[in-house]
Amino acid sequence: MIIAIDGMGGDNAPEAVVKGCVEAIKGNSSIHIIITGPSDKISAELKKYTFNEESIEIVDAKDVITNNEHPVMAVRRKKESSLYKALNLVKEGKADAVISAGSTGALMAGATLMIGRIKGIDRVALSPIMPGKNSPFMVTDAGANVDCKPQYLVQFALMGKIYFESVLGVKKPTIGLVNIGAEEEKGNELTKSAYKLLKESGLNFVGNVEPRDASTGDVDILVCDGFVGNTLLKMYEGVALNLFKMLKSEITSSTRAKVGALMLKPVLKDFAKKFDYSEYGGSPFLGSKGIVIKAHGSSNSKAFKNAINQAVSCSENKIIDKISRQLEELN
């Protein structure tokens, strides 16, 4: 399998990107990685490590797309950027997947304009896996489509179901519709119409899920439009971040608290691991004709390694073919 990596995407590029690539090929000799970016910078980073040099190659890219640029215009104009060249490798059939920790909007625009959507899919959905109290869960869409039609949400649910079954090994994953109340009649026109379609879809739909219940992980796939999903995602991240800050402040407030924390260290370590985004790799853009994964902007080498493994799993489990086939059956 050949994977294209945006070598300059993210806060820690290219150091974390290169290290993650090296760690990934050491764990899986069957993959080949193409890193796009300034060849001098990428080469300098690669020289720090010992690895099978035939497993990683560089495609020179002098430019970078930043988060401050208009996504569509940047993709169209910056054809010498690391992100454009990584996407183009998939478009031209020279790579099977693309991973970037750079601009989410530009990656989304590039995936849509350059790679395209699976036939029958109306919108590509950003679909991160989040840590839950009982088990991880997916939010789809988490920001790619601010405005949605009811049928889009049914497609998001189907794609999430296929990902959970194929990549995570969960049989008959549960699907919930994010809403302001659990009752069927709650919500706006979008959620009311989507509820009816999901109920009739044949998917394992369990009804509405209120945001306060989202983090339990009792429902595997939370379906919503991108505005709601992105708000939910950022609120969740913010609460987790501030919770850890509050906990740290309390632990360091007294000697007694420090002693207690020392005794609880293994428990606290496991708790922190649950909320470590690097454990989950990246967020797949479900519905794209190619495997497209958005890594977190502050991804470290572990996150990149896991995102690469995630791409491999998507390819080996043929999720694109499954989405195409099951969409036809649903319709």
UniProtKB/Swiss-Prot annotation:
Pathway: Lipid metabolism; phospholipid metabolism. SUPFAM superfamilies: Isocitrate/Isopropylmalate dehydrogenase-like (SSF53659). The gene is plsX. Homodimer. Probably interacts with PlsY. Its EC number is 2.3.1.274. NCBIfam families: plsX. PANTHER family: FATTY ACID/PHOSPHOLIPID SYNTHESIS PROTEIN PLSX, PHOSPHATE ACYLTRANSFERASE. It comes from Clostridium acetobutylicum (strain ATCC 824 / DSM 792 / JCM 1419 / IAM 19013 / LMG 5710 / NBRC 13948 / NRRL B-527 / VKM B-1787 / 2291 / W). GO terms for molecular function: phosphate:acyl-[acyl carrier protein] acyltransferase activity. GO terms for cellular component: cytoplasm. It is an enzyme of class 2 (transferase). Its main location: cytoplasm. Disulfide bonds: none annotated. Keywords: Cytoplasm, Lipid biosynthesis, Lipid metabolism, Phospholipid biosynthesis, Phospholipid metabolism, Transferase. It comes from the Bacteria. GO terms for biological process: fatty acid biosynthetic process; phospholipid biosynthetic process. It is found in: Cytoplasm. This is Phosphate acyltransferase. The keyword Nucleus does not apply. The keyword Protein biosynthesis does not apply. Belongs to the PlsX family. InterPro entries: FA_synthesis (IPR003664), Phospholipid_synth_PlsX-like (IPR012281).
